[in-house]
From Swiss-Prot:
Stored Pfam families: RNase_PH (PF01138), RNase_PH_C (PF03725)
Gene: rph
Catalysed transformations (reactions): tRNA(n+1) + phosphate = tRNA(n) + a ribonucleoside 5'-diphosphate
Function: Phosphorolytic 3'-5' exoribonuclease that plays an important role in tRNA 3'-end maturation. Removes nucleotide residues following the 3'-CCA terminus of tRNAs; can also add nucleotides to the ends of RNA molecules by using nucleoside diphosphates as substrates, but this may not be physiologically important. Probably plays a role in initiation of 16S rRNA degradation (leading to ribosome degradation) during starvation.
Family listed: Belongs to the RNase PH family.
Species this chain originates from: Nostoc sp. (strain PCC 7120 / SAG 25.82 / UTEX 2576)
Record's subunit section: Homohexameric ring arranged as a trimer of dimers.
NCBIfam families cross-referenced by the UniProt entry: RNasePH
Origin superkingdom: Bacteria
One MF annotation (Gene Ontology) recorded for this entry: tRNA nucleotidyltransferase activity
Protein's recorded name: Ribonuclease PH
Matches recorded under SUPFAM superfamilies: Ribonuclease PH domain 2-like (SSF55666), Ribosomal protein S5 domain 2-like (SSF54211)
PROSITE patterns referenced in this protein's UniProt entry, alphabetically: RIBONUCLEASE_PH
InterPro entries: ExoRNase_PH_dom1, ExoRNase_PH_dom2, ExoRNase_PH_dom2_sf, PNPase/RNase_PH_dom_sf, Ribosomal_Su5_D2-typ_SF, RNase_PH, RNase_PH_bac-type, RNase_PH_CS
Length: 247
């Protein structure tokens, strides 16, 4: 039996992806990331200080926070006020780890970049959309810092994107929506850089197990999607050639 995708996409086809840059007024970097029906607002703020463990090192830092609006899902959920759920903590750590791989912290200097990812509407893939859109917002923020003379050179030495993949009817599918995410027997979140090096892989079998061959199929599927996302990011960042200093 072959899985029929609810939106008619092919197995290795992404949902439509759009980055609306300069979406808010005050944050140096802000992007509304739309991935199908998933919508995540990514902003980047700058503080002229670093955590205590970096004070005097000459190096900067990047951290991330992730939240969902109560009405982002079909059934309203309570706001996380006094204590974050384990899921929220895991996701914001993933976002931070992933985007730190894009930066030269010596070039950033002793300042902290905070990436805020706020899910406005969730149809699965919120963490991968937050990483992919968060990178665009990060580039926008760095562009602003260079224009203002805060930075002498760009610290953007890497490019990062992320996508979900899963097994449905024993076959690999790219960029799962909510219906597919629930039905998948195996699902992965894959983060890669510009050279398709793996930054992080989160994966689990919901039912039974999966083979090494299927694992390779899932990674190949993710690689196909990330190549497209990397291009979309570059097209959304107006001064990409000036900002990116990596290889």
């Amino acid at each position: 039996m072959v899985w029929q995708r609810p939106d008619g996409r092919k197995p290795y086809e992404l949902r439509p992806i759009n980055f609306h840059t300069k979406f808010t007024r005050f944050a140096p970097g802000s992007v509304l990331t739309i991935c199908g029906e998933t919508k995540v607002l990514c902003t980047v703020s700058v503080a002229e200080s670093v955590p205590k463990f970096l004070t005097g090192s000459g190096k900067g830092w990047l951290t991330a926070e992730y939240r969902m609006l109560p009405s982002a899902t079909q059934q309203r959920h309570e706001r996380e006020l006094l204590k974050l759920s384990g899921r929220t903590q895991e996701i914001q750590r993933l976002i931070g780890r992933s985007l730190r791989a894009a930066l030269d912290f010596e070039a950033l200097g002793e300042r902290t970049l905070t990436v805020d990812a706020d899910v406005l509407q969730a149809d699965a893939g919120t963490r991968t959309a937050a990483i992919t859109g968060g990178f665009v917002a990060l580039a926008e923020a760095i562009s602003q810092l260079l224009q203002r003379g805060v930075l002498e050179r760009s610290p953007l030495c890497g490019q990062i994107a992320a996508v979900s993949v899963g097994l449905l009817e024993q076959e690999a599918y790219l960029d799962l929506n909510y219906i597919e995410d629930v039905a998948a027997t195996v699902d992965f979140n894959v983060v890669m850089n510009k050279n398709l090096g793996i930054i992080e892989v989160q994966g689990t079998a919901e039912e039974g197990s999966f083979s090494r061959t299927q694992l390779n199929q899932l990674l190949d599927c993710a690689e196909t999607g990330i190549q497209q996302l990397l291009i979309a990011q570059q097209q959304a960042i107006t001064d990409w050639d000036r900002l990116f200093v990596g290889k």
